[in-house]
């Protein structure tokens, strides 16, 4: 790796990142959609394939997770207008937000209460389908609800699934795998919250805890799976299937925007702010949105000031060859879902030509935003899920991106979507603690 001093000279923004200051980085490598898609390792066909697979499984999902009955086994979340929060942001940050503000509530996705219910559940279902088809338990024409049988559960019990996680991916993989009958092990990093470990164990999942961070948990999970031919490893750092499971969100969102009569075109730009850990969730969603809205959607990743792994990987072009710890950042944050020191090289390289930018936000800010959203809209998210909330303020305030893309005149007709990535499964006492922290920090600030 280039010497750190050389990197700092080449990328002056690194100095601010090292000081854990909040920054906004505009991606100089973003290309027009038509150019970017030509070199992409994934295509619209891949996303369609994932969408069809989820449809095939819908009857099974509706049967085994009654909370999805109403949506006929489709795992989806509400898209809500949040005008009171918008007013509060404008007042608190003394910055007008041009355009409408909405919250995509993946925090309230059924089954596992986070964005990871998309990619995680999808990858487990795909693996189950492959095994069942190979062994004649299923044909693609069958009603997949037949998988809810003792015979199928006994069959899947011969196989195991492993994953490394800071929490939410572990929940979605663990809950789904256990429901199908797989033996499942979740390797959890030091920052994983206790209640997430407890919940998994209550579902019959084997949880292994590590003193080290996320990368170590993934490494150990991979090692265990390599030693056991019947074990399938969900590789959060490199998985195309996870990525595609997230990408399906885009066409669902398109339908919701149409229902709300919100237009997205050249005169009506769409901005989407996505909390980013290793990169799979936000990368997949952003990729799906780019396929649909091309140059009319502008996607920004949001990371904690203490874990800006994707920003550093993208900015330096080193991707997964650099970790935040290499430049003296500690990767310690209360935004547990985003506490990742080394980004996914696959996601970074795939998204580099599509992504508008990336910004960082402090833990203190996340807590204040958590309290504000609860007060104004009565919506409770976990700290990491608030990372996107400051995005519209940042992009409108530091308007270099808007100027560069000649969007200033179009902003009044634009739409901002903050992706709320998790929170509905947080136990009440834990959420009260988050709220109180936000309250104390708000008083301090004033």
Curated annotation (Swiss-Prot):
PTM-bearing positions, type N6-(pyridoxal phosphate)lysine: 116
Cofactor: pyridoxal 5'-phosphate
Pfam families: PALP
Enzyme class, first EC level, given as a word: lyase
GO MF entry, a single one: hydro-lyase activity
Similarity comment: Belongs to the serine/threonine dehydratase family. DsdA subfamily.
GO BP annotations, alphabetical order: D-serine catabolic process; isoleucine biosynthetic process
Catalytic activity: D-serine = pyruvate + NH4(+)
HAMAP family linked: D_Ser_dehydrat
Gene3D superfamilies: 3.40.50.1100
Protein name: Probable D-serine dehydratase
Keywords, comma-separated and alphabetical: Lyase, Pyridoxal phosphate
Taxon lineage: Bacteria, Bacillati, Bacillota, Bacilli, Bacillales
CDD domains given in the database record: D-Ser-dehyd (cd06447)
PANTHER family the UniProt entry points to: D-SERINE DEHYDRATASE, THREONINE DEHYDRATASE, MITOCHONDRIAL-RELATED
Matching InterPro entries: D_Ser_am_lyase, Ser/Thr_Dehydratase, Ser/Thr_deHydtase_PyrdxlP-BS, TrpB-like_PALP, TrpB-like_PALP_sf
Residues forming coiled coils: none
EC number: 4.3.1.18
S-S pairs: none
